[in-house]
Amino acid sequence: MLITELRRSNFTLFLFPAATCDHARNMSSTSINGRGELNQLLRLAGPLIVNNLSIAGMNMADAMMSGRLGADALAAVAVGGSVWLLAFTLALGVLMAISPIAARYFGAGRPDMIGRYSRQGMYIAVAYGIPVVVFGQFLVGPLLALIGIDTAFRDLTTSYVGAIAWGAPAIYVFLALRFTTEGIGRTTPIMYTSVFAFVCNVFLNYVLMFGKFGFPAMGVVGCGLASAITMWLVALVFAWHIVVAPAYKPLKIFARLAPPRPEVLREIIALGLPIAITITAEVGLFAGMSILIGTRGTEITAAHQIALNFASTAFMVPLALSSAITIRVGQLLGRGDPAAARRAGGIGIVVCAGFMAASAIVLLVFPDFIVGMYTSDPVVSGIAVSLLLVAAIFQVADGVQIGAAGGLRGYKDTGIPMAINLFAYWLVAFPLAYLATITYVMPANFIWGAFVAGLTLAAVLLTWRFARLSRNSLTAS
């Protein structure tokens, strides 16, 4: 049924009936049919899925290899990684604004403007990266002391963050270049770079953490240093690729050293800061709910981590599709084809929902098998199975909300989505989770029910926002 609808040229009318037949008839000759649009989205998303899984693999490798050093080292990398994640997501969100901007200019046939925004994005990357280095070297220790972390564990965590922070300027410059590449629809180089990063990170972990090939064993410092070196290698390799690949020549990214342009910097930050706040709010929600569940005991906490890990892994696919939706919608709007942009967004949202529906079916049919891959503890297994059944409920909503968010970024609409997510996550989901936690009579799956409420509300509101905004764009055209 889904494929049949995707083949129809009036797919947008199927999803958003408010669009009129006149709008559909007025689509430009550059538009492609629903099946062709699906192929375009999957072509863009495929390499990004590999990229996301490679990043997840690096995090898993860090955890597994630091675990061989002992529980203290594993905990230090976990806590230090959370501190680093906060700094990383803030920059990630701001620099993500380059993707829809580049997509618009690419669709409009203005490669010179893409290069301008890419260069200014690198200024933002360096300006943000240097304070992160300073924070990692001098401020993490006092911060951990302030919240009461004991001295020995604090020293381990501080040394890890101090080492990984040296890579901040490089990884942020890479992000500026990566989102430029995304915007022009070249996602395959991103995939190759992420695989290269995974191999480098694991190899350098082995050498620096355990003292191989004549290097001293550095433990958690080696883990952080391996990540930092990998970040610099990735930035240099990707910059080299952009310099030598013919596809980037019209962009003239490195053709000259342009001074900072305040108006361009303001545009990137104004578009990207709401994205950064949205990502941070979502990361904060999951972290906060993990802390709340942690008050219920080790078995419930372990079960929560199992369910969250599987759900997060499945989320890598719609996350990549969301980026592909941003690219397609932005390019089609830049081309002056709002009807095709609306259709691309609608198809993307349905594909995200469809994949997550398939994931939900897997959770409903094979919960015991999935949990068995993580633990054999009967108590933890029983709780984890019940949480996976709740996770199956919010899978579709999670896919819809990330798909709609991707479409809205293509329209360069980030302020209202930020407000929607803050409301759904922190004024609905978290208070419900807190109430379920303090009552103690409610089982853990009631706490996870807060995920369902927040994500479902976000999905409904973001989809409504996309439908309205895309319809207004059609009317204006």
Residue ranges and their predicted role:
Residues 5, 12-45, 102-169, 215-273, ...:
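Short alpha-helical transmembrane segments in multi-pass integral membrane proteins
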Residues 95, 99, 164-183, 190-198, ...:
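Short runs within selected transmembrane alpha-helices of multi-pass transporters and secretion channels
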Residues 54, 58, 87-91, 131, ...:
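Residue-level hotspots within pore-lining transmembrane alpha-helices
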Residues 43-62, 163, 174, 197, ...:
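Transmembrane helical elements of multi-pass membrane transporters/channels
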Residues 32-64, 68-69, 82-101, 126-133, ...:
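N-terminal transmembrane alpha-helices
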Residues 53, 57-75, 144-151, 207-218, ...:
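Helix-terminus/linker motif at the lipid-water interface of multi-pass membrane proteins
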Residues 86-89, 133, 201-205, 235-239, ...:
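Hydrophobic transmembrane alpha-helices of multi-pass small-molecule transporters
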Residues 74-134, 171-190, 290, 303-367, ...:
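Small-residue-rich hydrophobic transmembrane alpha-helices
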